[in-house]
């Protein structure tokens, strides 16, 4: 397997985990629908995601019990599917953010002045 393919796969998996953390972080403040989540993530270029890419992540997070959804009427169109974080999601977010920050700090100390 070529190095670029390995790097690409690693980046894809890394971003999936980051998107889960970002989505849960956004849902801590209020329930949001898919397009609203996508728009909020796009405000930070490193977290920009397409609408088509966010829905499989939301489905997976729902299946894991980290988020749940409900339908609500919209003033300007069909009903919207809102997502909200569960208690399990809150616990998972806290655990993973702590682990992420711990790992991030360790990597920074190892990389020295590389960045």
Curated annotation (Swiss-Prot):
Q: Does the keyword DNA-binding apply?
A: yes
Keywords of this entry = DNA-binding
Write down the InterPro entries for this protein, in alphabetical order. Answer: Metal_resp_DNA-bind_regulator, Tscrpt_reg_PadR_N, WH-like_DNA-bd_sf, WH_DNA-bd_sf
One annotated GO molecular function is:
DNA binding
Q: Which domain of life is it from?
A: Bacteria
Matching SUPFAM superfamilies, A to Z?
A: Winged helix' DNA-binding domain
According to UniProt, the name of this protein is Putative DNA-binding protein YizB
